[in-house]
Amino acid sequence: MGKTIAEKILSEKSKSDAYAGDIVVAEIDQIALQDGTAPLAIRQLMELGTEVRAADRTHFFVDHAAPSPRRELSNDQKFIYEFAKKVGADFNPPGEGIIHQIMVERYVKPGDLAVGADSHTCTYGGIGAFSTGMGSTDVAVAIALGKNWFRVPESFRVQLDGSLPKGVFAKDVILKLIGDLGVDGATYKALEFHGECAENMTVEERLTIANMAVECGAKAGIFESDENTRKFLAELGREGDFREVKADEDAEYEKEIYMDVSSLVPVVSKPHNVDNVAEISEVEGTEVNQVYIGTCTNGRLSDLEVAARILKGRKVKEGVRLIVVPASRRVYLQALDKGLIRVFVEAGGMVLNPGCGPCVGIHQGILADGEVCISTQNRNFKGRMGNPNAEIFLASPATAAASAVKGYIADPREFL
């Protein structure tokens, strides 16, 4: 019997013939932690008193509170740095960028097994890795031993057919899928993406979709690695890291989902759940106070390019705050070279240093009572951006940029 991508990777890393439902102990290739979760893992390691065997595969990031707005957070960041230096682990200081963007730019390879103390670790499936989030204690064990136990997930085959219409982007595709499945519709499943549209997507588009797999409960979201993946890695100077990762033709899936993307329209996720998805026509005209373009979901160069295309020569509506945050230092420099940063600033926007920015509600753009934000992030839970008395809509960078110009949630198609 053939295997899914999830079964193949977990079989290889556990040196076993594993199928969905099996429990395996697997060697982990890459481990990631951010400043909100790393202190918990480090303290757990200290409590265990165990030797750190996987320091060379462990990467610490300061991205959630970057730069730190409070003394307590500064102390945590110092604590992380000192531990990383002591054990010889990789440390990425404030300003380098978001954990998931840097992991894809520098470290994760197709076919890797990666874990992270962050729920959106599933992002790396966009380059053909099996990657998943874990709690800080489980990640501490991974750092100590270089391995951990996994239950091999059942897989849903998600067939994306057709071509994306004007004004419809990868973000719209994944929001539509989450709206159809519900927030728990794929709990502990691996979403494996196939079909004409998936094959034609750039890696940056795939990363957007993989990033949000967890929002319908999925353990992982995975695309096959192909020539697009090779080109993506080559642009990063990492072509040697490429390997082909594909499911077997006769792999068995728990469920098969078919989506004709040609029929899609721009969508948004309404407050206060990600699966509360509506077509743009249902919410168009809703006034917004803040627009946020960035995050590990949509802070890459192609995201900034489409936003800049809409904003160029236009102004942000009076009374609206536009915040743009590139996902990494590399993306920031690319945006500078292409003149995108100038476009955002001339339009009246604010461009912040690479990091998570307003997404987690620690600093940088906390909403006031009664305010509405449209954001390219991945979650819109009550209080997500620092105020439970505010509302968050999720959308593509194009929809967000169009809304910044209009001052209300707007259809991006009139600008494209």
From Swiss-Prot:
Cofactor note: Binds 1 [4Fe-4S] cluster per subunit.
Pfam families in the record: Aconitase (PF00330)
Classification via InterPro entries: Acnase/IPM_dHydase_lsu_aba_1/3, Acoase/IPM_deHydtase_lsu_aba, Aconitase_4Fe-4S_BS, Aconitase_4Fe-4S_dom, HAcnase/IPMdehydase_lsu_prok, Homoacnase/IPMdehydase_lsu, IPM_dehydratase_rel_enz, IPMI_cat
Enzyme class, UniProt record, top EC level: lyase
Keyword entries, A-Z: 4Fe-4S, Amino-acid biosynthesis, Branched-chain amino acid biosynthesis, Iron, Iron-sulfur, Leucine biosynthesis, Lyase, Metal-binding
GO BP annotations, alphabetical order: L-leucine biosynthetic process
Molecular-function annotations in GO: 3-isopropylmalate dehydratase activity; 4 iron, 4 sulfur cluster binding; metal ion binding
Domain of life: Archaea
Pathway terms, separated by semicolons: Amino-acid biosynthesis; L-leucine biosynthesis; L-leucine from 3-methyl-2-oxobutanoate: step 2/4
Gene3D superfamilies referenced in this protein's UniProt entry, alphabetically: Aconitase, domain 3
EC nos: 4.2.1.33
Keyword field contains Mitochondrion: no
Annotated residues for binding of [4Fe-4S] cluster: C296, C356, C359
Catalysis: reaction(s): (2R,3S)-3-isopropylmalate = (2S)-2-isopropylmalate
Cofactors: [4Fe-4S] cluster
Subunit structure and binding partners: Heterodimer of LeuC and LeuD.
Function summary: Catalyzes the isomerization between 2-isopropylmalate and 3-isopropylmalate, via the formation of 2-isopropylmaleate.
Similarity annotation: Belongs to the aconitase/IPM isomerase family. LeuC type 2 subfamily.
HAMAP family, alphabetized: LeuC_type2 (MF_01027)
Protein name (Swiss-Prot/TrEMBL): 3-isopropylmalate dehydratase large subunit 2
Taxonomy of the source species: Archaea, Methanobacteriati, Methanobacteriota, Archaeoglobi, Archaeoglobales
